[in-house]
Amino acid sequence: MEKTVISVKVRQNSIEVSGHAGAAPRGQSVPCAGVSGMTWMLAKGLKEIVDLPGFGLSIADGHVTMHWDQLTQSAEDLIDAWFLGLCDIAEEYGCIEFI
């Protein structure tokens, strides 16, 4: 199976995650499941726990975009924790490209 990359773009007012790790057939990839679960948790946390002003979410096959007006400290803390988890997955599986 050809290995591809999950791309992660973190900007001041947005996060974009796209791609597939290619570590296993679609739906069976441990790194993809980890990134997907962590990213979904981040989106739910920013929307429902932090209630981040101007938060928006767009989901398509293999692509998630989140955007907001201005970060709060609570939102930054959630994003930092999410990012640390992604770094662990990247180190273990080598399938995440941070842009």
Residue ranges of each PLM-predicted region?
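N-terminal intrinsically disordered, cationic/polar leader segments
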Residues: 1-30, 37-99
